[in-house]
């Protein structure tokens, strides 16, 4: 095993026990080779083993192999159901998942779950399928940030979406955007914060940007940038130190391959050592202070089968105090282990000098022979072979024997809240009970560890105070506050307009709303909003509407079918008659999809035009014109004619002077007969017709006379 070592000086001044200088040490080594030369693979540390998943081989061909490293050797694990390259792997709730990726035919927009002897697809409906993305898990959710969504050969920008898959609800959601479009970034998630370094951004552009993302509140902050630009590296994180290994690192006009940089005190620093085999687009897992790097492009851009380790050694980090308890002339301190070789405890009071004790490699200690009623100040300092680490915060305690305050947790329900609590130290005597105060009103709840508050008022602030007591006395107060909530009850109103409809709602509780509009099982709209109305622009039709109100208590769903058509008004018809032909035309009516024309109760046509001409039948003709759509028909516009095609429209007589004309309104066909004077033109027409008829009679009589003779 080869080994290179660097001691990088870090100026950290320790208060206890004397001034000293702390160091950081990096080492690199090569371990057992992996079974195949791979690049663009993904990996995870799961069940005490290293899983190396997918990637591309020496022939740039995506593979479905899964290799497992256990007890110092590699073996072939259950293969993926299909080849994947540039996927992401994460462990959530003791389960291994593989997310996204691509192969020679497609981008995989889903998640594979490891089931011990194989893999199964649990979803394939990622909103934006990607590869080369950032993948991690938090709070039973799998996060997918950025990545590439293009399967061609052109250089296109990656995406910047934050896509989240909820393992409890089996649903995807896009919750926001990263500050940049990112792919093939180096990243590490420490359980609460995601550190992101470099990556490809616009097309083939590398970036020097460094970000921290907090999934708890979906926020980003920027850290000082790298000295150069980078993509395809891996990121380690240990005891608050972040370090970047390998990748395409371009600085001062040249690519520096295999570089190792670390971030300290607001500055990126070069360690001046490199990977023993410089790599890009490798994959890695962090196990304690060791970052294990697998595969990647090696020298000459040839996929490597190297398994390398970069180890970081630090003075121990600052210990976190777990508890401090006062007893009779004693103080017991407990702290969380920092992997130190041992610990010093220093304690003092305002009336005594400092006392330092080397307590060895333990995580609790009881200081004895103290004076009751005197406040003591205590500090823990870790140490190892590199020196003293960062001291803990100074804590104080007064020897006594009452309990420590209990730790309270609140689970908010629908107009209720469940309080649970537990003790950190009972003072050396059994806990006898608890006093519970709600907004200042207290009761003795006895020796229980949970209590349910009911009939709460939504939106009201409740302050909970809890005191534990034993036979010596009461603990100090433990306090927590919360705002009561209820499920949102919805009242929904729809206003139909010409170019769409407005969905408006009232809610009894503040919530986020998800409005979904679909038609024939096709989702046309899915929008998340905090507003209480939304205008939906769609054509006329029948739609399924779903409105969900989501808050801390739960989800309220309101669903209904909307028949989106409006009642058209009666058309206003212009008409004219030429001999036996009537011509109709009208203006377009809002809400109408087509028009119906009846003559004497018989449908003549169904037309989408605004004009129509047809021949009248002999005798009286009553014409009705309707504006209609799939669900509504207007009142008719009626044109009535008796024999000589004399027409009256909507109860308003058209002054054509022909006797014996019956007037029919648009709403009433029983109007009385009217007699009007005939004008000159009409009289000439009548006389002409009469003369022609007489001539025809004379011709017929003459023919008969000739035949007779």
UniProtKB/Swiss-Prot annotation:
PROSITE patterns, A to Z: FN3
Segments forming domain Fibronectin type-III: 315-405, 406-488, 489-566, 568-643
Signal peptide: 1-22
InterPro entries registered for this protein in UniProt: FN3_dom, FN3_sf, Gal_Oxase/kelch_b-propeller, Ig-like_fold, Kelch-typ_b-propeller, Kelch_1, Kelch_domain_containing_8
The Kelch repeat ranges on this chain: 49-94, 96-140, 141-192, 193-240, 242-288, 290-340
Keyword DNA-binding: no
Record flagged with keyword Repeat: yes
Alphabetized Pfam families for the sequence: fn3, Kelch_KLHDC2_KLHL20_DRC7
Keyword annotations: Kelch repeat, Repeat, Signal
Name listed for the protein in its UniProt record: Kelch domain-containing protein STK_09390
Species per Swiss-Prot/TrEMBL record: Sulfurisphaera tokodaii (strain DSM 16993 / JCM 10545 / NBRC 100140 / 7) (Sulfolobus tokodaii)
């Amino acid at each position: 095993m080869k080994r290179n070592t660097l001691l990088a000086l870090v100026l950290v001044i320790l208060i206890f026990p004397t001034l000293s200088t702390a160091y950081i040490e990096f080492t690199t080594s090569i371990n057992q080779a992996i079974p195949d030369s791979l690049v663009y693979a993904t990996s995870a540390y799961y069940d005490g083993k290293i899983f190396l998943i997918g990637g591309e081989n020496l022939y740039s061909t995506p593979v479905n192999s899964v290799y497992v490293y256990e007890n110092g050797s590699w073996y072939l694990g259950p293969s993926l159901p299909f080849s994947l390259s540039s996927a992401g792997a994460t462990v959530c709730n003791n389960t291994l998942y593989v997310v996204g990726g691509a192969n020679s035919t497609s981008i995989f927009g889903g998640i594979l779950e490891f089931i011990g002897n194989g893999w199964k697809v649990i979803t394939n409906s990622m909103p934006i399928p990607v590869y080369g993305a950032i993948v991690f898990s938090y709070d039973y959710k799998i996060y997918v940030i950025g990545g590439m969504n293009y399967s061609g050969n052109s250089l296109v920008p990656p995406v910047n979406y934050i896509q989240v898959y909820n393992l409890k609800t089996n649903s995807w959601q896009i919750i926001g955007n990263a500050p940049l479009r990112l792919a093939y970034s180096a990243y590490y998630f420490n359980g609460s914060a995601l550190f992101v370094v470099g990556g490809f951004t616009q097309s083939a552009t590398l970036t020097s940007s460094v970000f921290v993302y907090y999934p708890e509140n979906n926020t980003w902050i920027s850290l000082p940038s790298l000295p150069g630009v980078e993509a395809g590296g891996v990121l380690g994180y240990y005891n608050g130190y972040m370090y970047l290994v390998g990748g395409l690192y371009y600085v001062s006009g040249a690519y520096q391959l295999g570089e190792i940089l670390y971030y300290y005190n607001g500055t990126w620093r070069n360690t001046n050592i490199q990977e023993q085999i410089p790599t890009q687009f490798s994959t890695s897992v962090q196990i304690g202070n060791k970052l294990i790097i697998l595969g990647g492009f090696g020298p000459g851009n040839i996929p490597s089968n190297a398994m390398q380790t970069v180890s970081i050694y630090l003075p121990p980090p600052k210990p976190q105090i777990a508890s401090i308890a006062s007893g009779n002339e004693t103080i017991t301190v407990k702290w969380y282990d920092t992997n130190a070789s041992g610990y010093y405890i220093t304690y003092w009071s305002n009336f005594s000098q400092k006392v330092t004790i080397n307590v060895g490699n333990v995580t609790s200690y009881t200081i004895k022979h103290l004076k009751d009623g005197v406040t003591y100040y205590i500090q823990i300092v870790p140490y190892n072979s590199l020196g003293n680490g960062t001291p803990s915060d100074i804590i104080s305690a007064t020897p006594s024997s009452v309990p420590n305050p209990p730790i309270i947790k609140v689970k908010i329900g629908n107009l209720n809240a469940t309080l649970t609590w537990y003790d950190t130290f009972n003072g050396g005597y059994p806990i006898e009970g608890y006093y519970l105060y709600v907004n200042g009103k207290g009761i003795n709840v006895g020796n229980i560890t949970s209590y349910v508050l009911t009939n709460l008022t939504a939106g009201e602030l409740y302050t909970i105070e809890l005191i534990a007591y034993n036979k010596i006395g009461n603990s100090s107060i433990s306090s927590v506050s919360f705002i009561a909530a209820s499920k949102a009850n919805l009242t929904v109103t729809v206003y139909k307009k010409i170019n769409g409809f407005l969905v408006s709602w009232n809610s009894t509780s503040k919530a986020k709303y998800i409005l979904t509009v679909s038609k024939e099982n096709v989702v046309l709209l899915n929008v998340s909003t905090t507003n209480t109305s939304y205008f939906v622009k769609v054509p006329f039709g029948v739609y399924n509407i779903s409105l969900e109100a989501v808050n801390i208590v739960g989800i309220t769903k309101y669903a209904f079918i909307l028949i989106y058509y409006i009642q058209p008004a009666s058309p206003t018809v212009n008409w004219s008659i030429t001999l036996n032909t009537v011509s109709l035309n009208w203006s377009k009516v809002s809400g109408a999809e087509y028009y119906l024309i009846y003559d004497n109760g018989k449908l003549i046509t169904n037309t989408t035009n605004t004009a129509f001409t047809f021949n009248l039948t002999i005798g009286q003709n009553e014409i009705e014109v309707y504006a209609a759509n799939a669900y509504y028909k207007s009142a008719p516009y009626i044109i009535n004619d008796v024999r000589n095609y004399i027409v009256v429209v909507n109860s308003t007589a058209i002054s054509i002077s022909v006797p014996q004309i019956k007037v029919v309104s648009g709403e009433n066909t029983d109007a009385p007969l009217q007699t009007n004077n005939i004008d000159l033109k009409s009289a000439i027409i009548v006389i002409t017709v009469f003369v022609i008829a007489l001539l025809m009679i004379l011709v017929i009589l003459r023919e008969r006379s000739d035949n007779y003779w």
